[in-house]
C-alpha cells in the first residue's frame, strides 16, 4: 500500500482523494526542496540518518525524505534511527514495517535515558535534560553508523515555539538553525521541514495512515513547549499572519535575521551543549 501511495504522489492521481493527497505531498516536498536550496542541506554522497521518535513529525519526515530521494538531483542515502528511551510500552513494529516498505534501513538504539531522568535524577521538569540526552545519543548513534548528517523533524511551529521559549524563559532571541555543524561529533544536523506548517504535517500523516507511536512519557502534554503552543494559537487568533511574519523575521538579512548566515551561504557551526 505504501508503494502505491508513493507512486500516486510521484506520478499523479485518479480519484479526488488521491488528488488531494498528491497536492498535500507536493506541498511537503516543496517545503523540503526550498529548505534544501536555501540552507544547502544535502550534498552529493551524504549519508543521512533520520531521527524517528515515532511521532507524526519524524515519521512524515522519514516518508517524505524517502520520496524526495527519488526526485532530488543530489544523490544521498537514508537510514532511520529510533532511541529506545526505556519507557514502556514501546512498540516500533509499525515503524519497522514502514522502513521495509520504503527501503530504508532501520536501527533501534537502547538507552537508559528514562531511568536517568525519572529514577536517578527524579526530574520535575525533565524536558530540557531529556532533549539534551536524546541529542547526544542520536549524534553518537549517527557517528557510530558512519553517517555524516542527522535529519530531525522540526516544522515551522517548532521553530517559532522555540523562539518564544527562549525569549520568555531565557531572555534571549534564539531558535535552532536549519543546518548546524556540531564540531565535537562531526555530525551536521539538518531540519528539512522548517518551512512546513504543522497543519500540513497533521493532514498528511493522517492521510497516509503513518504508524504513529503514542508517547509513554509521563510529562507529555504538560510542558513549557505546550504552553508556547497555546500562546501561539491565542496570538494567531488576533494576528492571523503572525506565524508567517515570525518565520520571515528569522530570515531578514537587512535586520538581525537569526538565520541570515546560511541564507548568505555561510555555514553555522555549534558545539554540543
Go through the PLM ranges and name each one.
Residues 4-11, 17-163, 169, 199-207:
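ATP-dependent adenylation/nucleotidyltransferase module used to activate substrates
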Residues 78, 149, 157-237:
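Catalytic subdomain that performs nucleotidyl-dependent activation
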Residues 85, 111-113, 194, 217, ...:
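Residues that form or immediately flank small-molecule/cofactor binding pockets and catalytic motifs
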Residues 131-143, 179-185, 232, 236-251:
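Short, basic, helix/turn surface patches
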Residues 210-273:
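The feature marks non-catalytic terminal segments
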Amino acid at each position: 500500500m505504501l508503494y502505491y501511495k508513493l507512486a500516486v504522489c510521484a506520478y499523479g492521481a485518479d480519484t479526488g482523494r488521491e488528488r488531494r493527497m498528491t497536492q498535500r505531498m507536493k506541498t511537503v516536498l516543496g517545503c523540503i526542496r526550498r529548505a534544501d536550496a536555501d540552507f544547502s542541506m544535502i550534498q552529493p554522497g551524504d549519508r543521512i540518518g533520520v531521527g524517528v521518535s515515532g511521532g507524526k513529525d519524524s515519521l512524515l519526515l522519514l516518508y517524505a525524505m524517502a520520496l524526495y530521494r527519488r526526485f532530488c538531483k543530489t544523490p544521498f542515502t537514508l537510514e532511520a534511527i529510533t532511541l529506545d528511551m526505556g519507557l514502556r510500552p514501546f512498540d516500533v513494529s509499525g515503524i519497522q514495517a514502514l522502513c521495509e516498505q520504503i527501503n530504508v534501513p532501520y536501527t533501534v538504539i537502547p538507552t537508559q535515558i528514562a531511568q536517568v531522568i525519572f529514577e536517578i535524577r527524579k526530574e520535575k521538569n525533565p524536558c530540557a535534560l531529556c532533549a539534551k540526552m536524546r541529542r547526544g545519543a542520536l549524534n553518537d548513534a549517527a557517528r557510530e553508523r558512519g553517517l555524516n548528517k542527522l535529519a530531525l523533524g522540526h516544522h515551522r511551529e517548532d521553530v517559532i515555539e522555540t523562539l518564544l521559549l527562549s525569549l520568555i524563559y531565557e531572555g534571549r532571541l534564539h531558535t535552532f538553525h536549519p543546518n548546524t555543524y556540531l564540531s565535537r561529533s562531526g555530525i551536521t544536523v539538518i531540519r528539512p521541514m522548517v518551512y512546513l506548517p504543522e497543519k500540513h504535517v497533521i493532514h498528511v500523516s493522517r492521510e497516509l495512515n503513518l504508524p504513529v507511536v503514542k508517547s509513554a512519557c509521563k510529562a507529555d502534554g504538560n510542558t513549557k513547549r505546550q504552553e508556547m503552543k497555546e500562546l501561539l494559537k491565542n496570538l494567531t487568533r488576533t494576528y492571523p499572519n503572525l506565524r508567517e511574519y515570525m518565520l520571515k523575521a528569522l530570515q531578514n538579512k537587512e535586520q538581525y535575521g537569526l538565520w541570515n548566515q546560511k541564507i548568505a551561504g555561510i555555514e553555522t557551526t555549534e558545539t554540543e551543549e
